[in-house]
Each structure stands twice: as structure tokens, then as C-alpha cells.
Amino acid sequence: MTRGFGPFGKIQEALKKAQEVRDGAQRLQKELEEMEIVGEAGNGLVKVTVNGNQEPLKVSLDPQVLQEPVDVVEDLLLTAMVNAYTQSAETMRKRMEELTGNISLPGLGLG
């Protein structure tokens, strides 16, 4: 309860909310590290897997794609990488928004 404490109550409430965000961020970090997001190209012939922090985990090539010219394989690999990275970055953005979206820090003009 912040009544009667004036600015001190607001500071205490802000510190409590900051701790909640910190705890949530730690949980989110672990969740992102464990997440696997797959980017594909060439109708699934090339797959790149990254975690929620955009760190590469695995590349998978269908043997059929190796019959293509090198430049085609390179383009497919790049497309799959960009796809995986984009999905991962969007997932991270949404999760961070969920974590901080409802946080307002009273009296500090931040919420």
C-alpha cells in the first residue's frame, strides 16, 4: 500500500515492478535459449534451425538439393537463414513486449 508514503511509496512500487521485469527477463532468456525455430527454403529442401536468440543450431539439406548448382544451394541456404532469423527476432520482440507491455512505473513518466 502506497498511501501515506508519498514519493517513497511510488519508488517502492516502481522497484517492485522493476524486480518483476527482471525476474521475467531471466525466465524469458532461458525460454529463448531452449526454443528451436526453423527457417525453410526450396519447399523444405533446406532448413536452418536457430534458437530464440538467433543463434544457429543446425542446418539440414535434403540430398536432392545437392544436385543443384552451387549458386542455387547458396541462395536457398541464405533464404532459409534469413527466414529463421526473422522468425526468431519477431518471436523475441513479441515475448519482450508481453513482458514489458503492461508495466508502468508510476510517477516516473515511463508507463
From Swiss-Prot:
Subcellular location: Cytoplasm, Nucleoid
Gene Ontology annotations for the cellular component aspect, listed alphabetically: bacterial nucleoid; cytosol
Superkingdom, taxonomy of origin: Bacteria
SUPFAM superfamilies reported for this sequence: YbaB-like
Chief location: cytoplasm
Keyword DNA-binding assigned: yes
Coiled-coil regions, chain positions: none
InterPro entries documented for this protein: YbaB-like_sf, YbaB/EbfC
GO MF term set: DNA binding
Keywords: Cytoplasm, DNA-binding
Description of how the protein assembles with itself and partners: Homodimer.
Homology family: Belongs to the YbaB/EbfC family.
Classification via PANTHER family: NUCLEOID-ASSOCIATED PROTEIN YBAB (PTHR33449:SF1)
Function: Binds to DNA and alters its conformation. May be involved in regulation of gene expression, nucleoid organization and DNA protection.
UniProt protein name: Nucleoid-associated protein CYA_1369
Naturally occurring in which organism (per UniProt): Synechococcus sp. (strain JA-3-3Ab) (Cyanobacteria bacterium Yellowstone A-Prime)
Lineage of source species: Bacteria, Bacillati, Cyanobacteriota, Cyanophyceae, Synechococcales
